[in-house]
């Protein structure tokens, strides 16, 4: 498992108090992990802080799953 995926999973588990077994790359923050729109904003802010990147609002709208977050962060930090 990649370092980025592990770090994203840790953030999601902590922020959403999610079951670690449910936090997979395909897991939707809203549909699978019970997040609401405010949770999504807080997750994006946590990703920005953890990885020292900026996620524009238009990009943040497309980050709906753990895998989406990992892909975006991987591209920004490459």
UniProtKB/Swiss-Prot annotation:
Keywords: Cytoplasm, Fatty acid biosynthesis, Fatty acid metabolism, Lipid biosynthesis, Lipid metabolism, Phosphopantetheine, Phosphoprotein. It is found in: Cytoplasm. Residues 2-77 form the Carrier domain. Disulfide bonds: none annotated. SUPFAM superfamilies: ACP-like. 4'-phosphopantetheine is transferred from CoA to a specific serine of apo-ACP by AcpS. This modification is essential for activity because fatty acids are bound in thioester linkage to the sulfhydryl of the prosthetic group. The modification O-(pantetheine 4'-phosphoryl)serine is found at residue 37. Coiled coil: none annotated. InterPro entries: ACP, ACP-like_sf, PP-bd_ACP. GO terms for molecular function: acyl binding; acyl carrier activity. GO terms for cellular component: cytosol; membrane. Its main location: cytoplasm. Pathway: Lipid metabolism; fatty acid biosynthesis. GO terms for biological process: lipid A biosynthetic process. Carrier of the growing fatty acid chain in fatty acid biosynthesis. HAMAP family: Acyl_carrier. Belongs to the acyl carrier protein (ACP) family. This is Acyl carrier protein.
